[in-house]
């Protein structure tokens, strides 16, 4: 037995300039076929539906605006201190900023990009955008 769904449809006859309102009765299979054929159509019904979300996948995005974090995204050492490859902080361990606005120690990002992997590593390790240093 197919469930009958009442639907109000308002037709706009532009040649006559008046609105006619009529009731249509459609079976649920006809309704689904119509919605499949015309996915942009929203039909008003009095049917309420209850759903349960069993799984939810969430994705977030963030970026440093001015290299504003205090630590390197690779070695997690403070920018004020030296990276793992340097003995002393300063000009020998410069901070570099990518076009994605993520900041790293120069030695850390150079080592990251040069590391052998199956995939190209000329990408920011935090956001995977192509890595280019802001000059």
UniProtKB/Swiss-Prot annotation:
Main localization, broad class: nucleus
Record protein name field: Anaphase-promoting complex subunit 11
Extent of Acidic residues compositional bias: 8-17
Zinc finger (RING-type): 83-128
Keywords: Cell cycle, Cell division, Developmental protein, Meiosis, Metal-binding, Mitosis, Nucleus, Ubl conjugation pathway, Zinc, Zinc-finger
Source organism per UniProt: Caenorhabditis elegans
Protein family according to the UniProt entry: Belongs to the RING-box family.
GO cellular component, one term: nucleus
Molecular function GO terms recorded: cullin family protein binding; ubiquitin protein ligase activity; ubiquitin-protein transferase activity; zinc ion binding
InterPro entries: RING-box_E3_Ubiquitin_Ligase, RING-H2_APC11, Znf_RING, Znf_RING/FYVE/PHD
Subunit structure: The APC/C complex is probably composed of at least 12 subunits: apc-2, apc-10, apc-11, cdc-26, emb-1, emb-27, emb-30, mat-1, mat-2, mat-3, such-1 and gfi-3. Interacts with ubc-2.
Biological process annotations from GO: anaphase-promoting complex-dependent catabolic process; cell division; embryo development ending in birth or egg hatching; meiotic chromosome segregation; positive regulation of mitotic metaphase/anaphase transition; protein ubiquitination; regulation of meiotic cell cycle; regulation of mitotic cell cycle
Effect in UniProt of substituting residue 100 to L: Loss of ubiquitination activity
Entry's localization field: Nucleus
């Amino acid at each position: 037995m197919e469930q009958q769904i009442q639907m109000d449809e308002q037709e706009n006859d532009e040649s006559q300039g008046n609105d006619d309102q009529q009731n249509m009765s459609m079976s649920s299979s006809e309704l689904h076929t119509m919605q499949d054929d015309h996915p942009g159509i929203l039909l008003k019904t009095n049917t309420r539906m209850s759903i349960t979300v069993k799984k939810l996948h969430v994705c977030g995005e963030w970026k440093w605006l001015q290299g504003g974090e205090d630590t390197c995204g690779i070695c997690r050492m403070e920018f004020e201190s030296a990276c793992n490859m340097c003995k002393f902080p300063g000009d020998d361990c410069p901070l570099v900023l990518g076009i994605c606005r993520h900041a790293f120690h120069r030695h850390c990002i150079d080592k990251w990009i040069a590391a052998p992997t199956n995939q190209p590593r000329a990408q920011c390790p935090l956001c995977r955008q192509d890595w280019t240093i802001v000059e």
